[in-house]
């Protein structure tokens, strides 16, 4: 049987007739939100309701986990465990066809209502094992975002997690890939005082789940064993920060964080936490000892039968702001090893902002030339602004080094010499307050 919500098809052939799991009354509230509010209003609703489930299921930041994946627009995607559709919209915007599998009818309807204008979305409602028997399509991508840890619930077997990947792999095209996001069982946040995400207790995962069953996350070593046992699968490893739920930066083995880069700590939106030590300092120690991949809070894997070699090696999002200015920065590696930097609009409304970066670059080049400060060259390529990938010591690094060594006089001299150069440039250029500047309550003294 099929029914439609807007343009979205819900196939209920394998639906058992009632939802076998639910978060209770909050799901009724979320269904009403998805039905009664446009996606553009979700952030306002999140702000007003002040509810963890509403933030978790409706925040656009959730899409950051895969919105940067280099889709061509011709892909067929299978999303397993689509829930309320936190990342479904990002897939629909980038792929040709999206098929979701979700056990809960209510969550499927939430997904359908919020994406009812998408004509390339079909939701199969029911148990994965029942639906999987009837899948005949081969997919370019299969996604498991916050799903793999529930493998014991999806697959009834002696080795459910290995079998889960084996079964999924059968539905990939020869060059197809699995996108899998999951918490790291040994993530630093758990040592620092955050509770285990699924059970809400301290140290449950890092002690090996001695008191709980049904959900399980893995260390990197454990996951490599699962990949090998599932058919010697290969993976590109990424590390969403602060975690995969609300990632603002995504590093990889080919582009790990720099010292001092990991400093966020206020990301436990769902529960209180302990502060047992300063995470930023411990991260620096882990980085200097090549241990960060073992203790990253979350993993994002792009898995294939052959090594995927996904082009982007680093992504940083700047999309907690007006949609007209919402972008992300991507560093990609070509087959010859050459690195390039791109500024990419996160929303269609931000395309004009990215195009304007080329004009800004030209203007700054002229302004800074007299002070012998070179501006990173920028050129427009499609909807993106492409910049050079430069290596070297930044002014910030130099100042930090001088501070660590107690060379404060040199630090002050270097810092204020740069400040003077900037002042010399801008004293020649009158700052004009535009109407937009005044509207944003930025009418201070300059």
Language-model features: locations:
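Conserved kinase catalytic-core helix
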Residues: 360-372, 396-441
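ATP-binding glycine-rich loop module of kinase domains
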Residues: 325-357
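ATP-binding glycine-rich phosphate-binding loop
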Residues: 292-298, 308-337
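Conserved class I S-adenosyl-L-methionine
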Residues: 179-202
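Conserved SAM-binding loop of SAM-dependent methyltransferases across substrates and taxa
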Residues: 84-95
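A short glycine-rich, Lys/Arg-flanked "PGG" loop and its adjoining helix->strand segment in the class I
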Residues: 159-177
């Amino acid at each position: 049987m099929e029914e439609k919500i807007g343009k979205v098809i819900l196939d209920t052939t394998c639906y058992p007739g009632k939802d076998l799991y639910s978060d209770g009354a909050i799901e009724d509230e979320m269904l009403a939100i998805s039905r009664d509010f446009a996606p553009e209003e979700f952030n306002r609703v999140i702000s007003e309701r002040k509810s963890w489930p509403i933030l978790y299921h409706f925040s656009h930041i959730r899409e950051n986990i895969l919105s940067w994946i280099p889709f061509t627009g011709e892909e067929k995607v299978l999303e397993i465990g689509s829930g309320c559709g936190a990342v479904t919209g990002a897939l629909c915007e980038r792929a040709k066809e999206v098929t979701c599998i979700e056990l809960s009818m209510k969550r499927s309807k939430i997904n359908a209502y919020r994406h009812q204008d998408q004509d390339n979305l079909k939701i199969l409602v029911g148990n994965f094992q029942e639906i999987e028997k009837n899948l005949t399509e081969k997919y370019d991508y299969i996604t498991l975002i916050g799903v793999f840890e529930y493998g014991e619930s999806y697959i009834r077997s002696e080795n459910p997690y290995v079998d889960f990947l084996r079964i999924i792999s059968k539905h990939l095209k020869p060059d197809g890939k699995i996108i899998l996001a999951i918490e790291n069982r040994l993530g630093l946040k758990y040592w620092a005082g955050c509770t285990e995400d699924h059970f809400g207790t301290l140290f449950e995962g890092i002690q090996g789940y001695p008191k709980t069953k049904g959900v399980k996350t893995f260390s990197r070593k454990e996951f490599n064993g699962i990949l090998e046992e599932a058919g010697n699968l290969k993976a590109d490893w990424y590390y969403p920060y602060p975690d995969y739920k609300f990632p603002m930066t995504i590093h990889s083995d080919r582009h790990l964080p720099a010292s001092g880069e990991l400093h966020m700590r206020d990301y436990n939106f769902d529960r209180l936490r302990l502060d047992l030590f300063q995470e930023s300092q411990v991260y620096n120690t882990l980085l200097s000892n090549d241990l960060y991949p073992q203790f990253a809070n979350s993993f994002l894997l792009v898995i294939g039968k052959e090594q995927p070699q996904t082009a982007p090696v680093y992504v940083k999002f700047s999309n907690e702001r007006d949609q007209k200015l919402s972008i992300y920065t991507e560093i990609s590696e070509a087959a010859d090893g050459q690195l390039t930097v791109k500024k990419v609009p996160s929303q269609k409304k931000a395309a004009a902002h990215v195009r304007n970066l080329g004009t800004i670059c030209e203007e700054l080049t002229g302004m800074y030339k007299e002070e012998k400060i070179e501006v990173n060259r920028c050129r427009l390529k499609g909807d993106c602004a492409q910049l050079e990938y430069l290596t070297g010591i930044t002014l910030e690094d130099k100042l930090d080094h001088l501070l660590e060594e107690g060379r404060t006089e040199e630090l002050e001299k270097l810092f204020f010499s740069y400040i003077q150069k900037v002042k010399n440039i801008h004293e020649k250029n009158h700052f004009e307050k535009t109407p937009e500047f005044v509207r944003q309550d930025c009418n201070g003294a300059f």
